[in-house]
């Protein structure tokens, strides 16, 4: 088995696993926008969740229907479609379904991007609303000096949202143009998936951070401590995005050089 086959297979399993995780996250636990299940209403689950992040960070979208409809719930459909879209056999066996699902997929991407705009307009960023005992840009990272660099963490979030939208545009254009370039379409679709699923990996890194603090400083050291929860949340977003992007580029590197960055 070649390195490229191994890379793509691991990538596919990773994408599928993270997609399932996010579907469960959105609809069941914590399910803040879900009409069928709200795990945060369970006292035991809420205590466990609050040890990692403040309750408001998880629940704040519950009172913002437009954000739920435009951003959160479409993300679950986006995750449901993604594994089918990137499965080689599915693409070959069901080309019409692949084309139709692809149009829906990129429409969902556009909706999610608009949902991020709503989040920004309503100032629902975690560093703005979820840690009232800390200043907006205080303790945004355990080690990155955003303020000394003249930056706010919102710039990181804007960059991530812009890249998500840009990769979707490139992926769609590569397949929809008259001179279709399916290798470029594949590369940009994977970059788009990495841009979106960095959010799922963030959840993993949050847990890893707290586990590391447990091992280094004693059980529960960082649990429920805003001064640690906030930078852990911010750094985990950066790490999740970086790991997803780097692994994606490794996979894309196995495509022919002439098609990796072309859009048509």
Where are these regions (language model features)?
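Alpha-helical membrane insertion/targeting regions
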Residues: 1-264
